[in-house]
C-alpha cells in the first residue's frame, strides 16, 4: 500500500512538472515566433538601405 501511495505521489509530481515546463516552453516559443520575423525584417532593411546608398554613390560619381 505504501508503494502505491509513493508511485501516486511521484506520478502527480511528474505530471505537475511536465505541465509547468510545457507552459513555459510554449510561452517562450510563441514569444520567439513573434520576435524572429521582426529581427529578420530589420536586417533586410539595413541591407536595402546599404544598396540604395551605394546606388546613389554610383550615380553621383563623375
UniProtKB/Swiss-Prot annotation:
GO biological process: defense response to bacterium; defense response to fungus; killing of cells of another organism
GO molecular function terms attached to this record: toxin activity
Bilayer-crossing regions: none
Signal peptide: 1-23
Gene Ontology cellular-component annotations: extracellular region; membrane; other organism cell membrane
UniProt tissue specificity: Expressed by the venom gland.
Protein name as annotated: Ponericin-W-like 32.2
Function: Antimicrobial peptide with potent activity against a range of Gram-positive and Gram-negative bacteria. Has high hemolytic activity against erythrocytes. May act by disrupting the integrity of the bacterial cell membrane.
Residue positions assigned to the propeptide: 49-62
Keywords from the named record: Antibiotic, Antimicrobial, Cytolysis, Fungicide, Hemolysis, Membrane, Secreted, Signal, Target cell membrane, Target membrane, Toxin
Organism: Lychas mucronatus (Chinese swimming scorpion)
Compartments it resides in: Secreted; Target cell membrane
Family listed: Belongs to the non-disulfide-bridged peptide (NDBP) superfamily. Medium-length antimicrobial peptide (group 3) family. Ponericin-W subfamily.
